[in-house]
Each structure stands twice: as C-alpha cells, then as structure tokens.
UniProtKB/Swiss-Prot annotation:
Keywords on record: Aminoacyl-tRNA synthetase, ATP-binding, Coiled coil, Cytoplasm, Developmental protein, Ligase, Mitochondrion, Nucleotide-binding, Protein biosynthesis, Transit peptide
Transit peptide: 1-46
Compartments where found: Mitochondrion; Cytoplasm, Cytosol
Name of this chain's protein: Valine--tRNA ligase, mitochondrial 1
Catalytic activity: tRNA(Val) + L-valine + ATP = L-valyl-tRNA(Val) + AMP + diphosphate
Gene: TWN2
Native species: Arabidopsis thaliana (Mouse-ear cress)
Amino acid sequence: MSLLFLRRAKPLFVSCCSATHSRSSFLSPTLTNQLVRSFHGSRTMSESEKKILTEEELERKKKKEEKAKEKELKKQKALEKERLAELKAKQAKDGTNVPKKSAKKSSKRDASEENPEDFVDPETPLGERKRLSSQMAKQYSPATVEKSWYAWWEKSDLFKADAKSSKPPFVIVLPPPNVTGALHIGHALTSAIEDTIIRWKRMSGYNALWVPGVDHAGIATQVVVEKKIMRDRGMTRHDVGREEFVKEVWKWKNQYGGTILTQLRRLGASLDWSRECFTMDEQRSKAVTEAFVRLYKEGLIYRDIRLVNWDCILRTAISDVEVEYIDIKEKTLLKVPGYEKPVEFGLLTSFAYPLEGGLGEVIVATTRVETMLGDTAIAIHPDDARYKHLHGKFAVHPFNGRKLPIICDGILVDPNFGTGCVKITPAHDPNDCEVGKRHKLEFINIFTDDGKINTNGGSDFAGMPRFAAREAVVEALQKQGLYRGAKNNEMRLGLCSRTNDVIEPMIKPQWYVNCSMIGKEALDVAITDENKKLEFVPKQYTAEWRRWLENIRDWCISRQLWWGHRIPAWYATLEEDQLKEVGAYSDHWVVARTEDDAREEAAQKFLGKKFELTRDPDVLDTWFSSGLFPLSVLGWPDVTDDFKAFYPTSVLETGHDILFFWVARMVMMGMKLGGEVPFSKVYFHPMIRDAHGRKMSKSLGNVIDPLEVINGVTLEGLHKRLEEGNLDPKEVIVAKEGQVKDFPNGIPECGTDALRFALVSYTAQSDKINLDILRVVGYRQWCNKLWNAVRFAMMKLGDGYTPPQTLSPETMPFSCQWILSVLNKAISKTVVSLDAFEFSDAANTIYAWWQYQFCDVYIEAIKPYFAGDNPTFASERAHAQHALWISLETGLRLLHPFMPFVTEELWQRLPAPKDTERKASIMICDYPSAIENWSNEKVESEMDTVLATVKCMRALRAGLLEKQKNERLPAFALCENNVTSEIVKSHELEIRTLANLSSLEVVSKGQHAAPPGSSVETVNENLKVYLEVDGAINTEAEQEKIRNKIGELQKQKEKLQKMMSVSTYEEKVPANIKEDNANKLAKILQEFDFFEKESARLAAETSNSGNQ
C-alpha cells in the first residue's frame, strides 16, 4: 500500500518501520529487492568532477537527467491518479460518498497537495545550504541525499580547526594516499574510520583537526608513469631523459592528484582542506632538506659502500622491509619479470675449482652458480684436517685464470656441511661480503644495473641476462669437465614487494641513517612503563613493534630514481684529483640546504683549491619524507602557530602492514626532530580482502573502487576500468573472468553512508576484512528504513509541532519511558566503545537501537495513539510526539559520525525547539551524552517481558497460520503470580499492538481453562500464552511439541535428582544451594504437571472432535 502524506487531509494509512523485518533477513539481503534508480538517484556533479568530463559527456548527462525527471513526474502523476481512484473506491464502500461538487473540489485540492514537484529537491547553488523539497521523497535515494551537503560544509569552514582556539586539540594526519591513480577500498576504510573519529571528537568539544595530504610515492609513481610511456610511446625513461620524464610525472600528479581529493570528498571526509599538502610541495621539500642536513650534521646520516637489495627492473636499491621472502622446498619454476621462460630455483649446483700447480681440485656448491664469475676466494675451516695441506694455496678460475686464495674462516664455514669448501663472492652475497671485509678480498661486481653480466664476468657471458647466464655457466662448466651435478635444496628467495623481481645483492655506495640510538628510543616509549608514551590498538602489535626495533638495521635512504626529493649532497671534484669519477673519494661530499651553501662550505673545506660541484643524482626513499609527515604538515621546521597548537598529534590510524615502513620511522624522526612522540595512540585497522578472503589484486579483477560501490556500476563498466588501466592484455583477460564470477550483475548503487557504515562495522574482524558487497547493500536498505522512520515522524508531529525545552520521562507512557531508557544505554555504550577504539561495537550498538528498538518496537507501539482523534489518547499522543522527536534528534546525532550525509539531511528536516538558536549543521552539535533521569531499569525489565511475550505470540502465529494471513486473533496470558499478571495487564495495549491481537485476556493460575482450538507457548517460568486459532490447530503437531518439552523437562529432572541423591549431599552442600535446587526441582515438576494437562486437553479435544 502506498504511503500517503497530505498537508491538511488525514492520512488513510501509514506503514513504516515494520516489525516484520527479522534480524536475519535484514543482515542477509539479496540483490532482487534493490530499488530502481530514478530521478532521485541522479545528482549534480562537483566542479572537480566536471573538469574530468568532456563537453559531449556533460551534454549527454544533462539530457539523461532531464529524461529521468520527466519519467519521475509521469510516475508521480500516475501514482496520484491511482491513489484518488482508491480513495473514491473506499468512500463508496464505506458509504462516505460526498456530493459530486464537494468531491470534485476535494480531489482537485488533494491532487495539488500531492504535486510531484514537491518531492524533488530544488537545485542548490554550489556551496550553499542544501535546498530541500517541501515533501520528503517516497524512497531514500543516496545520490539525492548526498548531493550539495559536502560543498556547503566545506565552504562554511565547518572542517577548519583554529590554532588560536581554547578548546583542547585533537589531531589526526591522513596517511597520504599515493598519487598513483584513484583511491581503492582500503583508502575508503581509512577515511571511514578517521572521519568517524574526527566528527565524534569535533561534536565532543574538541578543536578537531584532520590534515589531508597526498604522497609523491617515488617508486610506485615512477613505475606507473614508465608503463604509461612505454604503452603510449614505446619508450623507456632512459629514452626520454630525466628532465622530460620528471615533467611527465608532474603531469600525472596534476591529473590524478585531483581525482584522489575529489574521491575523498565523495567519501564525506571532513578534512581541513585549508591545510592540504603534497609531500613534494615547497614546505614539505624544505622540511625534507632540513631534516637531512640536521641528521647529517649530527652524524646520524652517513654514506657508505655496502651490499644493498637491488631491483634490476627498477634499477634501484630498496630497503630491507621492501623485500618479501618466499620459501622454496625443491626444484621450482618461477615467472621472473623480463624473462619469457620460467626460471629454476631450489637447486644446489656443485662444481670443481682446479687447484694451482696441479694439486687436484676442490668442490663447492651454490644455488646461484652464475655468481662464480665474481668469486675471489675459497673458504675452508681452519681446523678441517682434510684441507690442512691447502692452507695458503690457490685455486684457479676456469674461465679467466684468476687466482683464488684458499682462506681459513671459522665464522662462515661449517666443516660438516657439504664438502666443507665455500666459494666466496664478496660483491653479491651478504655473508661473503663480511668474509671479504675480514680477509681484505677483492670485490668484483659482475652485474649491470639492469641485471646483465658486465665485462667483469668475461667476454663469453657479457651482456647476458643473469638467469640466462646461469644456464650458460653450467654448460661451460660441463664442457671443461668441472660440473658435478645438482640436487634439490631448500632456500628462501627474496622478491621486491613492488615488482616481484628477484632481489640481487649488489655492492653500491648509498646514504644511510644510523638507527641504533633513535630506534632504541622509539622502542622504549612503547614498552617501558616509566617512559610509556605510545599505545597500540590492538595491543598485539606491541610485540611486533618490539621485534622490529630490537633487530633494527641502519636504513638505506637513497634511491636510484628520478622522481622524488633529490638528496641535498654535492660532490666536490678537485682539480688535483687523480680520479675524476663522482664519488671516488668519500671525504669530498658536502651536505647543505642549497647549492650556494654547499659551494661556501666546500670552499672552506678545500681552502685555496679549485673544485667543481656535482649534485648527487639519487633521490630519497619515499618513507623519509613520509616519516616527517606529522611534523611537516604543521609547518616544521618553522615554529608556526599550527606547530605550537597541534604538535604532537593525537592519534595515528593506519594499516598494520606499514608498521615499520611508516609508523616506526615517524616515531624515530618525530622524537629526534620534533622533541616528542608524534602521536600517543596508534590504531591499526584490518586489511581488506575480497569476499573469498583473497588479497585484492588488479590482475585478479577483485579490486573494489569505492566510487563504484557508491554510484553503482555495471559489469561492462567494471570491464572498461580494466581496459583503461595499466594491466598487461593477458592480465586483463584473467581479471575480467574474476569480475564475471564475483560481480555477475555489476555492483548496485549503495551510497557513501552505507559503504562507510559497512566498513566500520567490519573492523572487529581480526586483522583481515572479507568484504562482501551484499553487506553494503544491506546497510543501504537500512538507510531507507531510517528515511521512512523520519517520514512517519514528520507526519505524526505535524506542521505546528514545537519540541519541548525539557522532558519528564516519568510522566510519559510506558513505551516512551522505555525508548528513552534504552537510548540512554545505547549512548553510554557507544561512547565507551568509541573511547576504546572499538568502532564495530559502537556501530552495532547504534544500529541495534535504531533497527530493533526504535523502528521495530517503539514506532509500532505508539501507532494506536495516532489512530484518529481518539480523545482517550490525547495525553499519550502528546507525550509520544515529544519522545518521538527527542529519540530521532538524539539518535541522528549519535549516528552522524558514521553516516554524515543521511543524518544531516534528516536532522535538517526535524522541527527546531522554540526560542532556541539551532546550530547550522548536525556536525557541530554536541555528541549525545547519557542523561541520568532517562534510565529506568524497571521499565526495561517489564518491556523485556512484553517483547518476550510478543515473540512467543508471533511464533505461535507463524506456526499455525499461513504467512499471508494477518488477521487479529484472540490470546490468553496465563500468569503464575500477581507480579507477572500486573505487568501483562499494565502493558496489554503494547502486547496487543505488537503481536497483532484482537484481544488479550489475562488470567491467573487455576482460574481459566484453555479454550478449544488454542496453542500454547512458554514465555518464562511465570508466564504462558495461548493463541486461539479456530479450526487451524494441528493437534498432532501440538502433541509432538508438548512431548518434546516433556522430554527436555525429564532430562533436567533426572540430572538434578541425581545430583541431590549423592550420599554426601545433605552434609556438604551449603544450605542456600540446597534451597535453590529444591526450588528448581519444584518448578520442573510444576512444568511437568502443566504440560501433561495440556496433552490431556488436546487429546480430549481430538476425541470430542472425532465423536462429532
């Protein structure tokens, strides 16, 4: 039946927030009952989005919206025509026809009142307060509701924090998303959680600041742009040159940086955009340079030639934490970037080195046989008697004749492993590197930066890719008769987390941060009670923190990239230097803030000498600038008003996967350069997986774009996104297959509020979230329920309603007292959960109050008060209006941090209290706090009895009647005592209303025999209910139910009697427990008696029926 809302005419019937929606059916929604997108689903695009569309696309969109609007108007007119026909039919049936003339006037008036235009929001100029329709739309439309509010919030400076405010500060910095394309669902989770926190704190009286920023993402961005240039122009970055390539990256940043910020706005993120930053903007670059110079001057940054993790695809060093290891048990073929055929791993290859002077040979084994081209020694254990005769001898390299000293090293060599002889390649193995330093061996690098054999590897192999050289070396060894075979070997293989390339240890000069001291300080503030200034949520990550920082190594911060912060170091080449290569002399480096400063410092360092300065071409690790983020976003190194007011920040919210990448480095840098721990609490959110628990991957096609969930997208639209991306054509095919399987019908429009609420409610799922889009769809349907609840309230409140200045719950009807009491409890529980960072519990508490208490119970319970103008309910009606308004107004404020758009729109529609200046927006209202005189445990206890009774009545109805039957039935309540009897009698109206009963007769034990044709259900030990369904009773089914009940009672009785019959029972069991057991047994026997009589009653009814 349609919902009719007339301005002056009385509503015929209103049905909303039906209690028939069960918990399970709501939480497991199906796509079949999704709302069809109508004109209300269209929206006005933001200016930033318009820039992305062409004029032709805008014109097409405009025509589409106009067409949709015409369709909606026609639909509304058709509904109005149908409604008038129903009205006339009802009047004819009821004999309430009015004279034709009068009816004609009335129908014209009603038709004008239901003008479809009244249900459509007028267009709102960008940045102005949203202009709402005079009548609420018949259905919730996320696109319509979410339109216009954000631009108004932003233009009104509602997100802006004041550095001069006297309010206590609360500060969060947004983990800056990479400028590599669009936001993903993980960013949406971050935004949903952080915006929930910041809106809650803002409403709780804090000077709340949430700082936005975008990260330049050195390696990630360079990889993306390199792929784009290769795809578009067939060129590498080396082909286009550094200067041109960097220009291309800036173009990419300017294009996609705006997209990311637009998406954050669509997510409702209440970020202070006046403080927006980019990690390579002028102020952040100044901070990076200052940090590098200060740390260098203090001796914490230094340059050294060390073995590094080298990525041959990226041609750069990467840090230890960017290496992912896989365990290989035996011979395994793996796909390696840049190689057509899979490469063998998990083999231990043995070969012989001939000894100088014809003394024989030594056999060595390796998993990387190609590295023998760079061998410079063979190590044995000094105490190994087998090789005593080889001390001080040499082996000869079979390919180049190089003499390899046989050295004794008791640290590296295990005489009981293999042959007891170990080949040493100092330039390409961490352990061998240490041996090379101990024995002053030659370090021979055999690889080019892109992973090919260089001239040091010999002319027969030079130019070969390293894994092709592996095969060639084995063949060459076989030809010389030196190959001794290969066998399976367990090993750990290091892969780059970004490119999946096999890491090659390479000897390179790099810049490092000495982390020993600052790492210890960062550890102490999290684990020592006397210095504890940092807390992790969940607490389990404290152990992870300890593990990382107790084993911390110096941080390699230089990268051989073109995109990023150039290292502020210059090399001075002196005129007198014999070696002119940059970096040849380690003491010729000068670190300074500018080139002029460097020149001045070099002039002082090399007094009277001529020199040329060359800036280091390398850039800094992205995490270096990110590690300064809490400092740099507030103006550091300058002592700004923001820095004084807002540093240190309050909370860091991020994913646990970057605990060491980012969190540890921020703590180390913040303490060293800012003087304090940069935040006092770190909340680690779970990592999002797909519904099957798989990691989201573009190549699998299971990556979810938050905008596609908000706006909805067809399967074809999902495919199009893949085609426009950077995936290899083969990967596109696989990804499309994954999309067909996961999203056969695309993704329905869910809206921002539903997506946010779903993501926050998922946070209780340990360290991983298995995101099911159907759950988001369910919360979108719930938004429709909230919408209908307010529509119902607006009609019942009426145009002239004025909310009360004060409220006295004790004078209100029972259901009103109850809804305020449970609301009070929900408020307290929500605040406690938010304080504890238990966001899922907070969301579920709010959801449960709205869904199961306000909509399912309270709205249904007060409907009799509004059924006509019955003077009997005049007082109750007024009280119900007040409780309805206060519940809605408070409930919307409680929900707002989680669902900002729908709560703002619904709150703005509520009438304001008279003579009270209303806040402009719900987001700057006070967050609800518990009110002492609202709590009423007695009322809640009695309502528990009422609802338990209703539940039993509904169960009886469901078991006895077909689902489509909804007639009111007579019922009886059999009470064991006066207290129960009084409760049921006092709340007869609520029970009859909620259980849809025609009557409810309350009787005490022994006063009433159950009527024929009735079925019984036990509410509790003191209350049983009967539902009378004439002719619908299945006596055999009823008897089976009673037999099962008697069987359960028999088990309870036997268990209790067995315990009470123990010989020592009377002596050893305390008197109070014996008394309790005796009472339990008495009640069981009483129940026995009752159900035996019920069985006899049903048998008699069956017999009488048969006799008739």
